[in-house]
Regions:
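Conserved, well-structured ligand/cofactor-binding cores
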Residues: 1-150
């Protein structure tokens, strides 16, 4: 299947996803959209992050390092690099890759959690994840050792 199936999309809001909705996207290729409430929540949370960075606030993992480096302030010009390095440090795993339906389910679950508006993710990032689901662009996800964090 090269695209989503025709019909109404599943609007995710971070609160109302059920097993039937998950299966319709994962197994049947149903399209996904973001509910207006999710867009608003994600935008509001992102503004909190942007405001904290603009104020020079100390925010763990945003303007500081992680773990034993939590007390290390990261210069503003290196904040993107910090986040990229975090992704790189978590991109390892072993085992056979998950199948397409399992991967789509994980992608939808991640999008749904981000749609709650608690993580500070950019709306554009969440929109791209939804677009990847809809265009059936799936990462290879190892069955063991993969890390998922908000």
């Amino acid at each position: 299947m090269s695209a989503t199936v025709p019909g109404p999309s599943l609007a995710i809001d971070g609160h109302s996803l059920d097993l039937g909705g998950l299966e319709s996207v994962a197994r049947e290729g149903r399209a996904v959209s973001l509910a207006g409430s999710a867009r608003a929540a994600v935008g509001a949370a992102r503004r909190v992050v942007d405001d904290a960075v603009a104020r020079g606030a100390v925010v763990y993992g945003v303007t500081t390092g992680f773990g034993s480096f939590a007390d290390v302030r990261i210069p503003v010009e290196r904040l993107r690099e910090l986040q990229l390095n975090l992704v790189r440090s978590h991109s390892a795993g072993v085992g056979a890759p998950l199948d397409e339906a399992e991967t789509r389910a994980l992608m939808l679950l991640r999008a749904n959690v981000l749609a709650k508006g608690f993580s500070g993710v950019r709306l554009e990032t969440l929109e791209l994840l939804v677009e990847m689901i809809n265009r059936r662009v799936h990462p290879v996800v190892p069955s063991q050792g993969s890390v998922g964090a908000s």
